[in-house]
């Protein structure tokens, strides 16, 4: 006679198999993708160490009036909830699809005025060319990473 616990374990094992199958990574064909060459000029470690990369939560995102490219992000950087960063990625993303996501930003850049708005950092994106068209992916991480988490 099988114990009730044995039935539960067997059930969990059979349920885990389909779940594991769903997690198989989708294979992407990168044969038509071109990337920029890596910089040959080296950056010394002290200069790199001044770059402060942080996880940021996207609290709000909106198109910048009179700009076809710029999106205005209001971000939680773990210290204050009003860091504003502008990014020229509107061609690739609609504002509403980014709210609530966790992105990566460099927060140690001096403010830069763009379209009358001070941008207080830079969001990190990956850029490539595919079949003659530029592609861009905003670097987003697991939403379980808290705002302000430092990247090393």
State the predicted function of each range:
Residues 1-152:
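Phosphate-backbone binding interfaces of nucleic-acid-interacting proteins
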């Amino acid at each position: 006679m099988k114990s009730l616990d044995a039935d539960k374990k067997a059930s969990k094992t059979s349920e885990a198999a389909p779940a594991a199958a769903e997690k198989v990574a989708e294979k992407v064909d990168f044969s038509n993708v071109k990337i920029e060459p890596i910089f040959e000029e080296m950056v010394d470690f002290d200069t790199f160490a001044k770059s402060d990369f942080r996880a940021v939560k996207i609290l709000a995102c909106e198109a910048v009036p009179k700009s076809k490219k710029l999106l205005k992000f209001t971000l939680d950087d773990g210290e204050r909830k009003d860091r504003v960063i502008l990014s020229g990625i509107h061609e690739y993303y609609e504002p509403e699809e980014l709210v609530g996501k966790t992105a990566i930003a460099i927060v140690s850049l001096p403010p830069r005025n763009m379209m009358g708005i001070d941008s207080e950092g830079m969001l990190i994106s990956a850029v490539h060319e595919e079949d003659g068209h530029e592609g861009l992916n905003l670097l987003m991480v697991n939403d379980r990473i808290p705002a302000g988490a430092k990247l090393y």
